[in-house]
């Protein structure tokens, strides 16, 4: 017996079947075959052996002759091949063999929930089910999926299951019938067996993939014809010495196999592979009365035509008929064509006058004919009742008008170069007398990075061009320490010496403002013989300030003056530092604040909130990289809500537990015995001060603004960012420890930093009114203001700013 005959008989043993690659394993039910019924007759075996033995001379004469030689034998054994290829086992007469009852869908769903696809685990013997039969069915489901996953060395023996004794047999089943030396040439193979061995094996793989995707008998036949044509090309090329004989051998085997299959299927219909579509027979009453119309339209499977509900009858085995389940359009079946095609195809008229308007071939109109005509494609269905009947048609949804205004995101990035000073710590303030509370400041070297102000991110033009409703959604700063410089005198007196190896420390901090221990100040005076010791302070400087200790403002400092109307444009030194990439100074430094005679117990430990570095080890390193997303980053006046509807004065609205008024907390200063916090309410208003949305206002405004007419808000403040060079002592030969002499001699020191600043601004200009000249929004997105102005130049309390007055000159 040949290899192919043995393989075919092996595959025909009871209990075996070929599993298509695309079939879901959990939906495959392997039933038992029952008794050992022989499936192959000697005629079928002889046909297979003789087909495999056909040589090149016979192929040269034509494959049709070889197939025709055994056509009778192949037809008589068509049920054998159908059983082997599909797993639907029958006897030689085509009668189905007794099979085990299929596992119910309920059991499958239960199995999916228990095992979750993991069949490597043991079956839970203690599982409690309603009936013993359910447990048996669940065990069958479990064992079946283990076999499919290759987790079982042998099939469980017993009634209802065929078995294999080794993993080798299981692997052979997955492999299917393949020609030696090939991976895909043969029926029933998986699609993932690796790279094909040669060109004919590649053609066989493409043929298998076409099978896997086939949904109709036409697609199956097309795949077969394509493969046979390619196989014949390989044979001809081999005869002309254009290809190797190996390709010709494989091509011959493949062509004979497919040719044999096609010969069988001419009598039995397509039996392999199993396709999803099922043909339906046309109702006999339409076959008789619409015969000519059907003949004219069946070539395109009645594409785009609304067919009567009873046009087809019971399902039959799929054959070469061009009409299939897929050609019938139901009302709930989605299609790609537009609504204009639904029922819009008029049936053509034939030469004999028979048409869907009057399908009766005799010309006599009966009640049945009228009923059929009313359901006919292209006719006014139901017109006899006074209107168009849309039964069976797809629902047509009319598109609604909609304007998507979208949101524009713009990113503004700047690169600044700053110089900072190694300022000494010094306690400054007026002299206190008696029990009077006197202000005290202790200066630090921590320079403030003003990242809460817009000029760090954008120039005046960029700000002015932003439309109403623009808001910052994210801002980021990166602080890179470049290096530091320590200066000393080389011709000093005998009491001072120059030193080249001083230690220089660098300090950074994020969020000091939330501590509430201090404030940022600008230094206005220094000790005459010690320029690193500040002696006087004033409020921090951001905007232009006039006077001897004034400041031209961040905009002019970074970007220069306007050449059209700024008198300072031509002044010496008023050049734009950012525009030319040069260094400028940071104006404000952090100071701790305290009052005397308040019983607070001295200065808190600021150092525990600082990060300190040896400056020699962090040159050209990014020491701070922080991002902040404002909760209310509105930087332009908000969009308006245009009140319409009746009445425009809405009256009193019940809002439940929503807050209508903004809440405030009145905090009384120490001592502890007199501290108190009381609640205050503030009405919301749509009146906005002019300076609330200028370029120098703080980005975060959640303490001031409220989204919507009521609701809950949790305001927050933007954390501060500081960096500083610690003061470097000036060493002397004097006895500094004598009489506890204070260390008040400092070497001039400076640091150089780069600040990369970036902010993202969102803008949108929606409108709901066709003639509105400004953008508008709905009430829920309208911004209201609390009639209270927190002061960010003061110290925070519990993470928020109060509305106290700014500290004056100290």
UniProtKB/Swiss-Prot annotation:
Gene Ontology biological-process entries? clathrin-dependent endocytosis of virus by host cell; symbiont entry into host cell via permeabilization of host membrane; virion attachment to host cell
Task: Cite a single Pfam family from the UniProt record.
Answer: Denso_VP4
Q: Which SUPFAM superfamilies match?
A: ssDNA viruses
Which residue pairs form cystines in this protein? Answer: none
Q: Where in the cell is it found?
A: Virion
Major site of localization recorded for this protein: virion
InterPro entries per UniProt: Capsid/spike_ssDNA_virus, Capsid_VP4_densovirus, Phospholipase_A2-like
GO cellular component, alphabetical, reads: T=1 icosahedral viral capsid
Q: Where is the composition biased (Gly residues)?
A: 379-390
Region feature Disordered, mapped onto this chain: 316-366, 373-392
**Name of this chain's protein:** Capsid protein VP1
UniProt keyword list: Capsid protein, Clathrin-mediated endocytosis of virus by host, Host-virus interaction, T=1 icosahedral capsid protein, Viral attachment to host cell, Viral penetration into host cytoplasm, Viral penetration via permeabilization of host membrane, Virion, Virus endocytosis by host, Virus entry into host cell
Feature: compositional bias, Polar residues? 348-366
Superkingdom is Viruses
Q: Name one GO molecular function term.
A: structural molecule activity
Main function: Capsid protein self-assembles to form an icosahedral capsid with a T=1 symmetry, about 22 nm in diameter, and consisting of 60 copies of size variants of the capsid protein which differ in the N-terminus. The capsid encapsulates the genomic ssDNA. Capsid proteins are responsible for the attachment to host cell receptors. This attachment induces virion internalization predominantly through clathrin-dependent endocytosis.
């Amino acid at each position: 017996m040949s290899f192919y005959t043995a393989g075919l008989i092996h595959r025909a043993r009871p209990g075996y079947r070929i599993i298509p690659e695309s079939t879901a394993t959990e939906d495959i039910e392997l039933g038992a075959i029952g008794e050992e019924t022989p499936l192959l007759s000697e005629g079928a075996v002889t046909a297979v052996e003789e087909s495999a033995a056909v040589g090149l001379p016979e192929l040269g004469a034509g494959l049709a002759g070889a197939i025709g030689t055994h056509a009778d034998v192949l037809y008589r054994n068509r049920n054998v091949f159908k059983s082997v290829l599909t797993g639907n086992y029958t006897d030689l007469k085509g009668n189905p063999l007794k099979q085990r009852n299929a596992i119910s869908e309920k059991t499958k769903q239960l199995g999916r929930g228990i095992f979750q696809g993991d069949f490597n685990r043991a079956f839970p013997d203690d599982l409690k089910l309603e009936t013993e039969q359910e447990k048996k069915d669940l065990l069958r489901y479990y064992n079946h999926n283990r076999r499919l996953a290759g987790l079982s060395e042998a099939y469980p023996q017993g009634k209802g299951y065929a078995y294999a004794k080794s993993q080798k047999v299981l692997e052979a089943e997955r492999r299917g019938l393949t020609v030696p030396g090939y991976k895909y040439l043969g029926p029933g193979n998986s699609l993932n067996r690796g790279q094909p061995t040669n060109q004919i094996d590649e053609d066989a793989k493409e043929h298998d993939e076409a099978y896997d995707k086939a949904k109709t008998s036409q697609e199956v036949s097309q795949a077969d014809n394509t493969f046979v044509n390619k196989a014949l090309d390989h044979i001809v090329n081999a005869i002309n010495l254009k290809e190797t004989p190996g390709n010709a051998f494989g091509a011959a085997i493949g062509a004979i196999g497919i040719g044999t299959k096609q010969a069988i299927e001419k009598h039995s219909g397509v039996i392999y592979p199993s396709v999803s579509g099922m043909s339906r027979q046309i109702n006999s009453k339409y076959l008789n009365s619409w015969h000519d119309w059907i003949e004219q339209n069946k070539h395109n499977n009645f594409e785009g035509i609304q067919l009567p509900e009873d046009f087809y009858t019971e399902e039959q085995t799929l054959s070469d008929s061009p009409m299939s389940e897929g050609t019938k359009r139901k009302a709930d079946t989605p299609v790609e064509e537009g609504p204009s095609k639904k029922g819009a195809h008029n049936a053509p008229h034939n030469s004999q006058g028979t048409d869907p308007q009057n399908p009766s071939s005799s010309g006599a109109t009966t009640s049945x004919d009228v009923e059929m005509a009313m359901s006919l494609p292209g006719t006014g269905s139901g017109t006899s009742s006074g209107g168009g009947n849309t039964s069976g048609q797809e629902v047509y949804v009319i598109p609604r008008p909609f304007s998507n205004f979208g949101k524009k995101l713009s990113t503004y990035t700047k690169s600044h170069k700053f110089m900072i000073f190694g300022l000494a710590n010094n306690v400054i303030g007026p002299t206190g007398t008696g029990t009077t509370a006197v202000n005290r400041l202790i200066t630090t070297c921590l320079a403030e990075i003003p990242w809460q102000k817009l000029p760090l991110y954008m120039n005046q033009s960029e700000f002015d061009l932003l439309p109403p409703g623009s808001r910052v959604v994210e801002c980021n700063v990166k602080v890179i320490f470049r290096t530091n410089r320590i200066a000393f005198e080389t011709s000093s007196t005998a009491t001072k010496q120059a030193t080249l190896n001083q230690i220089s420390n660098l300090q950074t901090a994020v969020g000091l403002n939330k501590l509430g221990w201090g404030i940022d100040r600008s230094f206005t005076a220094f000790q005459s013989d010690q320029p690193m010791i500040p002696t006087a302070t004033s409020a921090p400087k951001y905007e232009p300030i006039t006077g001897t200790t004034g400041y031209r403002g961040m905009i002019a400092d970074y970007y220069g003056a306007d050449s059209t109307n700024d008198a300072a444009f031509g002044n010496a030194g008023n050049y734009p530092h950012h525009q030319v990439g040069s260094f400028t100074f940071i104006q404000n430094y952090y100071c701790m604040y305290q009052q005397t005679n308040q019983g607070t117990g001295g200065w808190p430990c600021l150092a525990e909130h600082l990060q300190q570095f040896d400056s020699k080890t962090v040159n050209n390193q990014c020491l701070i990289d922080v991002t902040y997303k404002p909760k209310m980053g509105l930087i332009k006046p908000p969009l308006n809500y245009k009140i319409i509807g009746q009445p425009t004065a809405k009256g009193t609205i019940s809002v439940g537990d929503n807050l209508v008024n903004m809440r405030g907390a009145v905090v009384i200063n120490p001592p502890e015995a007199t501290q108190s916090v009381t609640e205050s309410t503030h009405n919301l208003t749509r009146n906005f001060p002019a300076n609330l949305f200028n370029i120098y206002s703080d980005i975060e405004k959640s303490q001031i603004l409220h989204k919507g007419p009521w609701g809950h808000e949790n305001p927050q403040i933007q954390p501060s960012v500081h960096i500083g060079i610690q003061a470097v002592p000036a060493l002397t030969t004097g006895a500094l420890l004598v009489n506890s002499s204070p260390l008040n001699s400092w070497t001039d020191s400076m640091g150089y930093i780069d600040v990369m600043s970036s902010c993202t601004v969102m803008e949108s200009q929606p409108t709901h009114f066709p003639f509105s000249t400004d953008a508008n929004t709905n009430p829920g997105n309208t911004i209201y203001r609390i009639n209270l102005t927190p002061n960010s130049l003061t110290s925070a309390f519990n993470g928020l700013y109060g509305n106290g007055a700014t500290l004056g000159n100290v």
